[in-house]
Amino acid sequence: MKAGILGVGRYIPEKVLTNHDLEKMVETSDEWIRTRTGIEERRIAADDVFSSHMAVAAAKNALEQAEVAAEDLDMILVATVTPDQSFPTVSCMIQEQLGAKKACAMDISAACAGFMYGVVTGKQFIESGTYKHVLVVGVEKLSSITDWEDRNTAVLFGDGAGAAVVGPVSDDRGILSFELGADGTGGQHLYLNEKRHTIMNGREVFKFAVRQMGESCVNVIEKAGLSKEDVDFLIPHQANIRIMEAARERLELPVEKMSKTVHKYGNTSAASIPISLVEELEAGKIKDGDVVVMVGFGGGLTWGAIAIRWGR
């Protein structure tokens, strides 16, 4: 049995925070932010909207597209570093709200690589014959762990959710290969401090991301028995346009073959890849039979990538 993605969905908060808005909050400029990150604006969830609310909205869209009923879900995996609370988990909260009574549920904490960890975990359960339908959600309310007085990090992050239903597909479609990894020795470069603010050593994270994203892209292509010429589209974690471009150049892809949503939404951590996937499908940039590479990196340090032949 082969596992693939049956349907996707997303939730984007209404409130827009532009670079010009940030100019009034910290010592920065629109030009500085755009030049270094590619970000022009980001979305911020309302005070009374939490990760579970965004996750449910994205999940409902994904289930509808997949034509899978919530009661037919066997497992719910939520990738997040911003749960509503320590426990119960976001996955259990959305299990109740969706009415997915038979699904087991757990959260995954792998920061910006979390969605990749979730998809690969779901794949393993499906291809082993244990489960048939797994809901994977990447959701973050990063505005709740951002120091809005720190000019280095306040400009980066946004809120949102993306979801995918992973299930059985035909043998010539689905996930072709994957890579997951971690390097705990780099944990001090990106972490949450005692004030619940995100602390980042930008230089070290940048070096790690450029190297690892490129390597992971090449690795999953080789594991799938493919070459760079076989790749139709790249969806990198939307952290920084310079990091994204480095991954694209490693695959020798033209600009139009890489997803770019960072300018609209900023870095939404675990939500960025599924949000981008929805956008590119809606734009008609990914077609049945296309080979798509998705790759992310995050705090931990963690990374993950998959190569998938799109379709059912």
Curated annotation (Swiss-Prot):
Q: Where is this region: ACP-binding?
A: 238-242
Pathway(s) served: Lipid metabolism; fatty acid biosynthesis
Question: What inducers act on this gene?
Answer: Down-regulated by FapR.
Please name the InterPro entries in this protein's record.
ACP_syn_III_C (IPR013747), ACP_syn_III_N (IPR013751), FabH (IPR004655), Thiolase-like (IPR016039)
Top-level taxon:
Bacteria
List the keywords (alphabetical): Acyltransferase, Cytoplasm, Fatty acid biosynthesis, Fatty acid metabolism, Lipid biosynthesis, Lipid metabolism, Multifunctional enzyme, Transferase
Subcellular location(s) per record: Cytoplasm
User: Catalytic site residues?
Assistant: 112, 237, 267
State the Gene Ontology BP annotations.
Answer: fatty acid biosynthetic process
Query: What top-level class of enzyme does the UniProt entry assign?
Result: transferase
Task: Using the UniProt record, give the first listed, main subcellular location.
Answer: cytoplasm
Q: Which reaction does it catalyse?
A: (2S)-2-methylbutanoyl-CoA + malonyl-[ACP] + H(+) = (4S)-4-methyl-3-oxohexanoyl-[ACP] + CO2 + CoA; 2-methylpropanoyl-CoA + malonyl-[ACP] + H(+) = 4-methyl-3-oxopentanoyl-[ACP] + CO2 + CoA; 3-methylbutanoyl-CoA + malonyl-[ACP] + H(+) = 5-methyl-3-oxohexanoyl-[ACP] + CO2 + CoA; malonyl-[ACP] + acetyl-CoA + H(+) = 3-oxobutanoyl-[ACP] + CO2 + CoA
**EC number(s) reported in the record:** 2.3.1.180, 2.3.1.300
GO MF annotations in UniProt: 3-oxoacyl-[acyl-carrier-protein] synthase activity; beta-ketoacyl-acyl-carrier-protein synthase III activity; beta-ketodecanoyl-[acyl-carrier-protein] synthase activity
Quaternary assembly: Homodimer.
Q: What does this protein do?
A: Catalyzes the condensation reaction of fatty acid synthesis by the addition to an acyl acceptor of two carbons from malonyl-ACP. Catalyzes the first condensation reaction which initiates fatty acid synthesis and may therefore play a role in governing the total rate of fatty acid production. Possesses both acetoacetyl-ACP synthase and acetyl transacylase activities. Has some substrate specificity for branched chain acyl-CoA, determining the biosynthesis of branched-chain of fatty acids instead of straight-chain.
Return the PANTHER family for the record.
3-OXOACYL-[ACYL-CARRIER-PROTEIN] SYNTHASE, BETA-KETOACYL-[ACYL-CARRIER-PROTEIN] SYNTHASE III, CHLOROPLASTIC
Question: What family is it from?
Answer: Belongs to the thiolase-like superfamily. FabH family.
Name the UniProt record assigns to this protein: Beta-ketoacyl-[acyl-carrier-protein] synthase III 1
Q: What is the lineage of its organism?
A: Bacteria, Bacillati, Bacillota, Bacilli, Bacillales
